[in-house]
Amino acid sequence: MTAKKLVMVGYTHDTNLGDQVIADSAEYLIKKNIIDNEFSVERFNLNYSNEFNSFKKLKRKVINKILSRLSSSSSFDYKVGCYKRDYKNKFNDASAIVFAGGGMIKFKYQDCWAHISALVDTVANKPCPIFFNAVGVEGYDQSNYKCRLLKESLNHSAIKMVTTRD
């Protein structure tokens, strides 16, 4: 029997070491409690994007500066589209996805909203549940488009559970 693939996603190469500890702990607990090796656990770092990294001499800040001059919806659509293209093949055969730790539910200072939106859109039509484990929560601002997009994604039927550390 082929093992089912559980993908653990997060910001595992972030400077916040607490996020890495939470991800390591979650992976340990999952592997410890898997019965008969039914699942393989694979990690995916959300800080990585093929499209953003394909610009050899441009740094992400420069790309974001260019995007900031576009209309908000064009900029947001571009970012989400980049991540969706990255995720299309990565999560195609995933049986479940776990966001392990991190300040995932953020919209002001990081692209969590874009990562989460792209991931939910990518697996929306597949039987692949998404779980959020020990995530940090930043707040909510109804007037912020990114926050509303994040709220919409978190309320999608693919999201099965959210636990917070706050």
State each model region's role.
Residues T2-L154:
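Aromatic- and Gly/Pro-rich donor/ligand-binding loops
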Residues G18, I159-D166:
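A short beta-strand/loop micro-motif in the catalytic core of glycosyltransferases
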